[in-house]
Amino acid sequence: MDIGILSSLKPAQSFRDNSLGSFINSIDYSDSGEYVATTCSADDTVQIYDALDPKQVHTITCFETGIEVARFTHHDHNLLLSTTKGNKDIQYVSIYDNKRISYFSGHTDIVSSIEVSPIEDQFVSTANDKTLKLWKMNQSSRCLGNLDLPSLGIPAYDPTGLVFAVACHSLSRIFLYDVRNYGSDPFSTFTIDDSRYLSRFSFPPMMPEWKHMEFSNDGKCILLSTRANVHYILDAFSGDVLSRLEDFQELPFSNNFHGGSTTFVPQGNFVIGSADDRTLNVWNLRHTFHHKGKTRPPEHRIVSQSIINPGLVKYNPRYDQLLTAGSQLVFWLPEKYALTS
């Protein structure tokens, strides 16, 4: 992957299967990179798309339970869905026959995040009840572990699947846990302090609200996305701020988005993220460990009149394809493959 390919990304296909005036809440790729799932809370629907030949292929209606977040399991035709009505279960759903396989009960408020282990049929969930729960997909009767958090948590697995992290913005801390010893205290805690930089904008300095967290494919870095015009690349072993990814646009997106306005590009040392209404930024992370604390402006900006409010961004784990979502869903391809601009 190089900047030439990323800078040539063009909208190839767009969809608006959600109602007029509504926004897509969450997006996810299947492990194979062949399918996409989106949710729209306003419509109580989950849409499934073929990613390789972009088209809508299935709709799951959730009128009785509501819908917040959808995440693929390790099977292309199975999803985990968080509900907004009733007892706030997580549902394990078969897309193929639209059946609920099992229910994961325990959260007392809406589940805001679901992250699936990269190596096994296990997942973590965080909810507005300020808890994190660890689950086995074949054991829905009770969770494997429960953590009480000081505030809403943002979870992420490292690429080995042996560690999960949970970020708590209210404390400006990230806690790291050993999956094999989840009942113990975190084995590492990072306090994220960028007061010197942030004091340029407010006093006392205010850390922008955190929105999303993910590990790089090599496990060395953590991407911490915020709701403001700066995001962070952290050392995954020390918590040090390696880079600030700076933009000069405030992001006026809905508080109901579940995901990040930035994401790692799996095949290279780049981060791509949304900027203003019709713009994406590309940051180059080259020499990140040699220039710690460096503020990085975007190396390239992608502007297209075909996108509106790209509040969610996700890169295909298997193919050179980007997904953005806001009031519409857009599939992006390098220019030589894109059908439209």
Curated annotation (Swiss-Prot):
One of its GO terms (biological process) is regulation of pericentric heterochromatin formation. Pfam families: WD40. GO terms for cellular component: chromatin; cytosol; DPS complex; mRNA cleavage and polyadenylation specificity factor complex; nucleus. Keywords: Cytoplasm, Nucleus, Repeat, WD repeat. One of its GO terms (molecular function) is chromatin binding. InterPro entries: Swd2/WDR82, WD40/YVTN_repeat-like_dom_sf, WD40_repeat_dom_sf, WD40_rpt. It is found in: Cytoplasm; Nucleus. WD repeats lie at residues 19-59, 106-145, 252-293, 303-341. Coiled coil: none annotated. Its main location: cytoplasm. This is Uncharacterized WD repeat-containing protein C824.04.
